[in-house]
Regions:
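Alpha/beta-hydrolase superfamily serine-hydrolase fold, recognizing
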Residues: 1-173
Length: 173
């Protein structure tokens, strides 16, 4: 925005995968709360929107897919502890967007989740919560995909499928 000061909020689409999806979701909530601007859309690719990756997690995908894959529940716990400045931070919806009680006024949202990903269920639950709050939301689970599949490049069928969803979403279909 600094190099394009004439950019209008309706031209902004936030996009992020994994922790980047966390940042995009948190920024959308913060933008609404501050009233400074609101992006038109957000695209969250296998987003990390929660703060609990223990065995007690509300989301079964943490237990089902939290071992023996690239992203494990143990790594997620480590990342959470590195990211949080304090235990209190972990309770903030700017840290874990799914904790936000009021999800009204959020941008149009596309959420893509991976079938074999500890983050799958929280991403899908976040989409349901956004929809229940009256937002326009699409959620698609990429079958047989692992967390991080976007790094495989455009030759990957999972990436191609994702780009189809993204293009349709951006075109407003």
């Amino acid at each position: 925005l600094y190099t394009h000061p004439d950019t209008k909020p309706e031209d902004i689409t936030l996009i992020g995968d994994s922790a980047g999806g966390n940042l995009a979701a948190a920024l959308s909530i913060m933008a609404r709360d501050r009233g400074e601007f609101m992006p038109k859309r957000q695209i969250l690719i296998y987003p990390a929107v929660n703060n609990d990756y223990s065995e007690k997690s509300l989301f079964s995908s943490v237990r089902e897919n939290g071992q023996d894959y690239l992203l494990t529940a143990g790594k997620l716990k480590d990342y959470i502890n590195l990211y949080a400045g304090s235990e209190e931070d972990k309770l903030s919806p700017y840290f874990a967007p799914i904790l936000e009680k009021d999800l009204t006024g959020q941008p149009d949202t596309l959420i893509l989740t991976s079938e074999f990903d500890p983050l799958r269920d929280e991403g899908e639950a976040y989409g349901r919560r956004l929809a229940e709050a009256g937002n326009r939301v699409e959620v698609h689970r990429i079958k047989d995909a692992l967390h991080g599949y976007f790094a495989l490049g455009i030759r990957s069928l999972h990436v191609q499928e994702s780009f189809e969803y993204i293009n349709h979403f951006l075109e407003g279909e």
